[in-house]
């Protein structure tokens, strides 16, 4: 029997099937719309029924951007993935802001609603002001395999930061950016990378904002740190 897809829209689904296997309930989101709950008959072409509506009228007034999903080759040959938010040509100012997600091992270059929804809305504001925004899944981000995940073993602020330097070269060459007008920011591990960028690569970034950053790993969560630094 030929298998046919039931859910085909761009985005992400989390699905539960009824005991009778005739109905599904699922959670669905896209890169610019948050998660909502739906039910549908389990057959191709079935019309879903939306159960929840979690956005406000104020939220729905905005034409929230869908990011461009890109990839490029780092200097060691590894493919790196990212989201790019680009302003319209008449607003573009040639400057850029690079965002560093937290935890090290998270993933943000995906097609569904990000846990970084506050930053997403901030990036939307930056784009309206003319800035290009890069949201990078740097080395050690989740979902790209063992070698990717362990690339920062015993050297946090090494290969992961290098990916931002390589990203800068790519963005300047392909998005008409001024290499002297690129800033970087992030929180937690993203704050740590921001500090490493400003302190060890000051010639690369015009400015940075390190939010709630880790500054001394010896006083951070031992279970997290020991797995990476192996002490």
Q: What does each of the following model-derived ranges do?
A:
Residues 2-8:
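Blade-edge beta-strand/turn elements of extracellular beta-propeller
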Residues 7, 14-231:
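Serine-hydrolase catalytic core recognition
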